[in-house]
């Protein structure tokens, strides 16, 4: 047999895929990520418990020793790896964006494509490889996600900076994330994400494909500090940072280390995902000189900001304001800045050769902090008050590295700061006895006789709970923030009806609490969810079934003062397919937005399907729309949605130019039977969703439908109950 003839069949991944044939196919696979099948630790492994057994002081001691243990295969700049680990931690956390809560350092995703091969992450593969002996030593007591952030903290501390604290609890993923939209560009560093007057596409935060933030040379490489400031402000705002936090982060981070642009980037080899097997997961092998140390090429910029690049100081601002700056180019040809007239000669040490000295250098984006009027005021204040910079940087760094973790209740370890911060969406701790089963039954009876409809009870509970985002663990029913601004004004929450429902439920709450003599109380947050559970039980009873929906008390009510209105505005749904709601018309289809919301709610495709079917017959659409209410007995928890959707006696036809509304008519008589949206009809159109709908439309499905709906409903109601985990 010829050596060129393989006797085996093609590998499973070879050949043309369904997506090659049908590029617009609904991406349901994003609902089935993080499967136990890909996790080598098994479903029984509890990372939080494992982390609690970690000797944090010991691992920090090992990390501190690593900082100055320079390795020949990748020597430390200035004899200290601290700046490299700061960059690694920063770039791990810095992909977070507020628009959908995705990105960030909470999963260790920097280990996988595309992030492990982004142009902005050049040579961070070396940082993670330097950490491997420590990860190997402590095993599963610390995740890669936690270790990368902790290494950044220890790096700062080892260089004389006092950090604000550290919270562990970031569990690793084991495969690349498929749900994150990084942009539509097909080429690294393209910026097709802009339209109009440099309007950045939502939910993106970075200015170019493959960058964490902004182009350090300026917009599209144009070295204009004032124009760059506009990009900086937009990008950092989309990461939940205000101007003061932005200035502190840039100045604080650039107090340490250097950038690398010793030679032409053409000397740099392929990124890790494209490198050969012999590279063993490393990438960017450079043929320029030794390819490392003083010959390293990373960004193409060759900048060292301060005279003490491995010690905390105020020298960044001293240099920024102490010199006038002129444009030059790095050895790699990138735009950067040096003091005019040769000032500052020999001020800056060389990273590897003690006999060499350099002038201070700055990036275009560094000069933005001086030449943008708003940034300049903050920068000058920090320049004149170094203690304010230290405090602001400590707090901003903590926010950067913890913003995607959700409430403070999820933080683990002895270094969690005691101070409660507004961006952590604080909720008061339980300070009273909780209601028992007898109380729950009595409260449900009160709610059911209060005059509220099933639809009102269910839709209000759903509105409260479904703000949850599994991406950054924000939102949810705990806190009862649905009664506060901005949620009580959102169109999707039907403010007028919401106010009436809340008034009724507050009456039930007040009556119960005033009747207690032992300090027992029920929160409005619990009452809202309990009302939804009562509504589901009532709807099942209407359909001839007796069920009990699980309910766990223990939620508390947040105050308006504990609620950052601007921070919560990003949680407003532009679409909620579960309530058949679209705020406007978008380039993305309603069914894609449904899948996206289901993914944020951590739902599987079967859970999404059964919830849609149940919510429709419960009459929970926004505005009481009849679209998708495929039943003659609304507010009865039946499988009618599926039965009638799959009925071949109905012929469907679009009734709008955009094909977002449809009517279903009797195949024989032509009489109008139903109306529906794309979200409704996709469960009969998409082959995968139709297969699920068929399960619930079958004649033996009612019991399964009830059980599965209640399970999925309970899951959503408890998504933010980290105390129950």
From Swiss-Prot:
Per the record, the GO terms for biological process are: cellular response to hydrogen peroxide; hydrogen peroxide catabolic process
How does the cofactor bind to this protein, according to its record? Binds 1 heme b (iron(II)-protoporphyrin IX) group per dimer.
What EC number(s) does the entry state? 1.11.1.21
Q: Site of the Tryptophyl-tyrosyl-methioninium (Trp-Tyr) (with M-239) crosslink?
A: 90-213
Q: What does the entry's PTM section describe? A: Formation of the three residue Trp-Tyr-Met cross-link is important for the catalase, but not the peroxidase activity of the enzyme.
Annotated active site residues, numbered on this chain, are 91
Q: Name one Pfam family in it.
A: peroxidase
Q: Which reaction does it catalyse?
A: H2O2 + AH2 = A + 2 H2O; 2 H2O2 = O2 + 2 H2O
User: What InterPro entries does this protein map onto?
Assistant: Catalase_peroxidase, Haem_peroxidase, Haem_peroxidase_sf, Peroxidases_AS, Peroxidases_heam-ligand_BS
Tryptophyl-tyrosyl-methioninium (Tyr-Met) (with W-90) crosslink location in chain: 213-239
For heme b, which residues are the binding ones?
Answer: 254
Report the GO terms under cellular component.
cytosol
Query: Matching PROSITE patterns, A to Z?
Result: PEROXIDASE_1 (PS00435), PEROXIDASE_2 (PS00436), PEROXIDASE_4 (PS50873)
Gene3D superfamilies, from UniProt? 1.10.520.10, Peroxidase, domain 2
Q: What class of enzyme is it?
A: oxidoreductase
Q: Which UniProt keywords apply?
A: Heme, Hydrogen peroxide, Iron, Metal-binding, Oxidoreductase, Peroxidase
Any one GO MF term held by the record is: catalase activity
Q: Which cofactor does it need?
A: heme b
Briefly state the protein's biological role: Bifunctional enzyme with both catalase and broad-spectrum peroxidase activity.
Query: What PANTHER family does the annotation carry?
Result: CATALASE-PEROXIDASE (PTHR30555:SF0), HYDROPEROXIDASE I, BIFUNCTIONAL CATALASE-PEROXIDASE (PTHR30555)
Q: How does it assemble?
A: Homodimer or homotetramer.
The entry assigns this protein to a family as follows:
Belongs to the peroxidase family. Peroxidase/catalase subfamily.
Q: Which HAMAP family match?
A: Catal_peroxid
Report what the protein is called: Catalase-peroxidase
| Native species | Hahella chejuensis (strain KCTC 2396)
Q: Which lineage do the record's taxonomy fields give for this organism?
A: Bacteria, Pseudomonadati, Pseudomonadota, Gammaproteobacteria, Oceanospirillales
């Amino acid at each position: 047999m010829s050596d060129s003839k393989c006797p085996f069949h093609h590998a499973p991944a070879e050949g043309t895929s369904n997506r090659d044939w049908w590029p617009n196919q609904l991406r349901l696979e994003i609902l089935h990520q993080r499967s136990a099948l890909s996790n080598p630790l098994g479903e029984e492994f509890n990372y939080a418990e494992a982390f609690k057994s970690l000797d944090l002081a010991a691992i920090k001691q090992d990390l501190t020793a690593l900082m100055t243990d320079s390795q020949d295969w990748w020597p430390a700049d200035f004899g200290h790896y601290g700046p490299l680990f700061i960059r690694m931690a920063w770039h791990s956390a810095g992909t977070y964006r507020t628009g959908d809560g995705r990105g960030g350092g909470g999963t260790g995703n920097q280990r996988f494509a595309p992030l492990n091969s982004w142009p902005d992450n050049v040579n961070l593969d070396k940082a993670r490889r330097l950490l491997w002996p420590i990860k190997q030593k402590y095993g599963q007591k610390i995740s890669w996600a936690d270790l990368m952030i902790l290494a950044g903290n220890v790096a700062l501390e080892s260089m004389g900076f006092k950090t604000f604290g550290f919270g562990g609890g970031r569990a690793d993923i084991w495969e690349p994330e498929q749900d994150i939209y990084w942009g539509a560009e097909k080429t690294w560093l393209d910026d097709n994400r802009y339209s109009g007057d440099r309007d950045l596409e939502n939910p993106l935060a970075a200015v170019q494909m493959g960058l964490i933030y902004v182009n350090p040379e300026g917009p599209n490489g144009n070295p204009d500090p004032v124009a760059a400031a506009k990009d900086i402000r937009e990008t950092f705002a989309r990461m939940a940072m205000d101007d003061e936090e932005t200035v502190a982060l840039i100045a604080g981070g650039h107090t340490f280390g250097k950038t690398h642009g010793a030679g032409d980037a053409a000397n740099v080899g392929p990124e890790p995902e494209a490198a050969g097997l012999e590279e063993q997961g490393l990438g960017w092998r450079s043929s320029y000189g030794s390819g490392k140390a003083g010959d390293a090429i990373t960004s193409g910029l060759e900048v060292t900001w301060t005279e003490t690049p491995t010690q905390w100081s105020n020298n960044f601002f001293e240099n920024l304001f102490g010199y006038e700056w002129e444009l030059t180019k790095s050895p790699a040809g990138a735009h950067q800045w040096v003091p005019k007239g040769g000032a500052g000669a020999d001020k800056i040490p060389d990273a590897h050769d003690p006999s060499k000295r350099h002038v201070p250098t700055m990036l275009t984006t560094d000069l933005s902090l001086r030449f943008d009027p708003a940034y300049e005021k903050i920068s000058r204040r920090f320049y004149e008050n170094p203690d304010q910079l230290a405090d602001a940087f400590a707090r901003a760094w903590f926010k950067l590295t913890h913003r995607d973790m959700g409430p403070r209740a999820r933080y683990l370890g002895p270094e969690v700061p005691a101070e409660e911060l507004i961006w952590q969406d604080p909720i008061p701790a339980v300070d009273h006895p909780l209601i028992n089963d007898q109380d729950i039954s009595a409260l449900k009876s009160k709610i059911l006789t209060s005059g509220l409809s099933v639809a009102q009870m269910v839709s209000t509970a759903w509105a409260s709970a479904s703000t949850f985002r599994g991406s950054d663990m924000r939102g949810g029913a705990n806190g009862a923030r649905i009664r506060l601004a901005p949620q009580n004004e959102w169109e999707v929450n039907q403010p007028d009806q919401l106010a009436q429902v809340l008034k009724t439920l507050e009456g039930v709450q007040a009556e119960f609490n005033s009747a207690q003599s032992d300090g027992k109380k029920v929160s409005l947050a619990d009452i809202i969810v309990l009302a939804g559970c009562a509504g589901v039980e009532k709807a099942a009873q209407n359909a001839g079934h007796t069920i009990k929906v699980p309910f766990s008390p223990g939620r508390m009510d947040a105050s308006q003062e504990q609620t950052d209105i601007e921070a919560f505005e990003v949680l407003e749904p532009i679409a909620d397919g579960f309530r058949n709601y679209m705020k406007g018309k978008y380039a993305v289809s309603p069914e894609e937005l449904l899948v996206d919301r289901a993914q944020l709610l951590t739902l599987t495709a079967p859970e999404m399907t059964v919830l849609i079917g149940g919510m429709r017959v419960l009459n929970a659409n926004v505005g009481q729309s009849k679209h998708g209410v495929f039943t003659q007995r609304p507010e009865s928890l039946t499988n009618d949605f599926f039965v009638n959707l799959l009925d071949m006696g109905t012929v469907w036809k679009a009734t709008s130019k955009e094909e977002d509304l449809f009517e279903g008519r009797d195949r024989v008589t032509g009489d109008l039977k139903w109306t529906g949206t794309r979200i409704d009809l996709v469960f009969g159109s998409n082959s995968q969703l139709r297969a699920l709908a068929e399960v619930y439309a079958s004649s033996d499905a009612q019991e399964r439908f009830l059980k599965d709906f209640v399970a999925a409903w309970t899951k959503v109601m408890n998504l933010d109950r980290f105390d129950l985990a």
